[in-house]
A protein has these predicted regions:
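Residue-level preference for the first positions of well-ordered beta-strands
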Residues: 2-6, 29, 68-72
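Conserved GTP-binding G-domain of TRAFAC-class P-loop NTPases and closely related GTPase folds
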Residues: 2-8, 25, 88, 92-173
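Short His-Asn-centered micro-motif
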Residues: 7-9, 32-33, 73-76
Length: 173
């Protein structure tokens, strides 16, 4: 059975480092929205292109699943609904799904524990290699779905809804 590994964690938590280790272990293809922003070896992030980057990552993941390749989805995946397209693909193609945190799984828990400290801990987060500002990391942590350390239940992911879906439902009522 092929395997899909879904990485979880905020920017700078070591997801890509861990994904590269797992790539060797599982002979897997790594897909990430970040790769969409790579231009001639340089990371050129553009927030306006984020939806296109995630669609691109999903398309690449679907192609890998069609070929039966082991695949690693290396995005933040902080909310259950963000993982939903990948879990749906995994089910469609008969993949086993595993969840992994960054190189240091305690990073996310430590970040979550200090959220209440605000400005006092901003300096601690200014060292990630992506240059992601602390306030963005805090916003990612605020979206963290249930069971931050343990693997979420696939059924919870499959019934999860994005903020846009929830807003549309609210308008219909």
């Amino acid at each position: 059975m092929s395997i899909m590994i879904i990485m979880r964690g905020p920017s700078g938590s070591g997801k890509t480092t861990r994904a590269r280790e797992l790539q060797k272990e599982y002979n897997a293809l790594i897909n990430s929205a970040d790769k969409y922003f790579m231009v001639k070896g340089e990371y050129c992030f553009n927030a306006d292109q984020l939806p296109a980057a995630h669609n691109w990552c999903q398309d690449r993941t679907r192609c890998a699943c069609e070929d039966g390749q082991n695949v690693i989805v290396d995005n933040t995946n902080m909310s259950l609904w963000e993982m939903k397209p990948y879990v749906e693909m995994a089910e469609e193609f008969g993949y086993e799904v595993k969840f992994q945190w960054g190189k240091n799984p305690m990073f996310t828990e430590a970040l979550r524990a200090v959220l209440e400290m605000g400005d006092k801990c901003f300096a601690m987060f200014n060292t990630n290699k992506h240059g992601t500002p602390p306030e963005v990391i805090f916003a990612q942590l605020a979206k963290l779905g249930p069971c931050p350390v343990f693997s979420p239940d696939l059924r919870d992911i499959l019934v999860s809804k994005s903020p846009m879906e929830l807003a549309a439902e609210k308008e219909q009522v």
